[in-house]
Every structure is written in structure tokens, then in C-alpha cells.
Amino acid sequence: MTERVVLAYSGGLDTSVAIGWIGAETGADVVALAVDVGQGGEDLEAIRQRALTCGAVESIVVDAREEFAESFVAPAIKSNALYMDRYPLISSLSRPVIVRHLVAAAREHGADAIAHGCTGKGNDQVRFEVGVAALAPGLSVLAPVRDSGMTRDKAIAFAEERGLPIDVSKKSPYSIDQNLWGRTAECGVLEDPWAQPPEDVFVYSADPTVARIPDEVTISFIDGVPVGLDGRSLPLADLVAELNVRAGAHGVGRIDLIEDRLVGIKSREIYECPAAITLLTAHRDLEDLTLERDVARFKRGIDQRWGEIVYDGLWYSPLKSALDAFVDSASAGVSGEVRIRLVGGVAQVVGRRSPASLYDHALATYDAGDQFDQRDARGFIELWGLPTKVWAAREQRLNP
């Protein structure tokens, strides 16, 4: 019988309801664990106290902002991680760090199970449970919201009946998840894919249609990782936080996506990720300047697969580790600066430079000083086109 459970606690509706459900259904003590991944908003001490009010025997808050940035966001930047070519894995990246701390807390507090507040329709249930299986296969997992069949309306009623201090109602039923890397919103009117998202859904970004004076930022990279902004060296967490404000002020990073979930359904998601889109745009441009052509071409496929397996909850997998090794090798030398203009919802690259640049002005220029010997082109074309020429001659011979 489960005697102690560590619950991944967010302070929201589902996990607050989960505390009461676990106690009622299993009789186990609940240790609530809230992991700070830069979500901001409500004070974490208030969240800690809420867990105790909802019935947890212990409530813990872990500051994982730097860890999240350095160990999870940085690899995503190096991998140009965009699921379906658009979504920068906001929630997908935070779940593995939460899992890491859940497992550590379970060991510290003698728990034999962990729990999460995910529904059966989402991706996070997979990310939590597969992550726990990879790090601590002996731990069992409880999913009270999913396994009790509790709908959102029922969860709201459960919270209201027991006087749980949750700020949610049937009139404003958005489900929000946010962290340093961005913000997600779903449910409510957003479930109609034809409905335009109300402006009050957006928090990280201003209306991009409102004219503003453009801003310009210069982002410094070393080996594919952002290390500075406008000539100032910054820890990655601080750099991302500042860019969220500056790029968000110009409406950068709003994404309205019909998303293919891992569980097989399509969902409508609203994302805000000003810093993520700005940094990924800058990083990809710097790669164009510094990576050899064949490496760059091959890496695009690696990047896509990297994003897919992270989205699918396989952060702690052998394939992910193997892909990381390639990305780390390819990223050596992706160093330099990228200048970005922020205006009208767009992060536009307007300049880039690198000590490892493969751009050779003397070869690229059409002006005086051109060192490219155009006479070499004739022989190159002859050899490059030779297989096609031989094939065409055969076709004419066989099909006159």
C-alpha cells in the first residue's frame, strides 16, 4: 500500500484537487513539490501554503530556474527545437526538470510513488511517467485526475465544495502553463479553432498590430549558447527573462497552433514565447554563417527529430543522448553575434558576424577584388551533370 506520495504541484486546479483525491482514495500522505522554472506570476510561498491548506503534509518549493535554463533550454536552442516547425517546446522542456526533482524528493522523503495532475488527453502524463520510469523504475505513479475521470467542471465543483483556494471558474476556464521559455493557454473559447483568441489571453506579449518604435538587440553566442545581450554578459536565465520583456513589447512570439498531440488528437494551443522565437531565429542564422553546408543540411533532420522526441516525453532516452552528442559536436564554433530588429511581431535578423564565419567576402563579391575564378564553373557543371547526361542518353537509346 502506498503510504507517502510526492505530488508535482503547480498551485492550480488539477493538482490542488489531486491532494484531496489521493488522501481520500489511498490514505497516503501527500508531499507537494512545486518547482520554480521561471513561471513568475503568483508568489511561490503562497503556492506552498496553498498545498498545505489543501491537505498536504509537507510542501516544498525548489528554485530550478538556472538549472532549467542551462540544462534544458540551452540544448533546445542548440537544436533549433520547434515541434511542427512552430512550437518551441515550452511545457515539453520543463517536465524533465520537474521529474528530476520529483524523483529526488521521493528518495529524500521515503515515498514509494509520485503523482501528477495531468488529464488523459494531454502529453504531460507521458512526459512525467516515462521520465520517472527512466530515472526511478521502482517508483509507481498515480494520476488522480486522469484515473478518476474528473472533468474540468467536476474539478471546479470539487474545489468549490471543499473550499479549496483556487482562482478558477466556469466563466474563465483557461488552462495556463508558463515558465521562463514561454506561456501556453488552452480550453474555453480557444477550443473553437475558428474563434479569434481574445486579447486577454495574452500576457507575455503586446498587440503586434499597435505601432511602436522598433527595438534592436545584439545577441552573443558561444558554441551555440546565448551568453550576452548588447555587449553585456548574462546568465542564460536572465538573458531569456530580459528578452521576454523586450521582444514581448513588440508582440514577438505569438503562436496559434493546431497541434498534433502524442495521444493522437489535435488540439488548439495559444503560445507566447518572445524570447524563444528571438533566440531561435538568431541561433539558426548564426549557424547559416558558421556551419559547413553538409553539416548544416544533416543537422536540420537531427533538429527536427530532437524536437519530436522531447515533445514525446523521451528526454531521458538513449536516442536523445545520441542526438545530443551530434548537436554538441556541430555546435562547436557556432559563436558570434547576431543583430535582431524587433517590430510588429517579428524578430528580424539585420546583421551577423563571427570569428568562425565561413562567409568569404573575396569569394562572394561581384565587385573589384573578386577571387572566384569563374572559369572553374564549366568543368564543375560538366562533372556535376554527368550522371544526368548519361541517364538521358540511355533513355533516348531505349525509347527513341
From Swiss-Prot:
Which PROSITE patterns has this protein been placed in? ARGININOSUCCIN_SYN_1 (PS00564), ARGININOSUCCIN_SYN_2 (PS00565)
Catalysed reactions, as listed in the record: L-citrulline + L-aspartate + ATP = 2-(N(omega)-L-arginino)succinate + AMP + diphosphate + H(+)
Which residues hold ATP? 8-16, 117
Whether Membrane counts among this entry's keywords is no
Where does the chain bind L-citrulline? 87, 92, 123, 127, 175, 259, 271
Q: In which pathway does it act?
A: Amino-acid biosynthesis; L-arginine biosynthesis; L-arginine from L-ornithine and carbamoyl phosphate: step 2/3
GO BP term (any one): L-arginine biosynthetic process
* Keywords for the protein's UniProt record, in alphabetical order: Amino-acid biosynthesis, Arginine biosynthesis, ATP-binding, Cytoplasm, Ligase, Nucleotide-binding
Q: What is its EC number?
A: 6.3.4.5
Recorded GO cellular component terms are: cytoplasm
User: Quaternary structure per UniProt?
Assistant: Homotetramer.
The record's family statement is: Belongs to the argininosuccinate synthase family. Type 1 subfamily.
HAMAP family linked to this entry: Arg_succ_synth_type1 (MF_00005)
Could you tell me what this protein is called?
Argininosuccinate synthase
Which species does the entry assign this protein to? Frankia casuarinae (strain DSM 45818 / CECT 9043 / HFP020203 / CcI3)
Q: Which gene encodes it?
A: argG
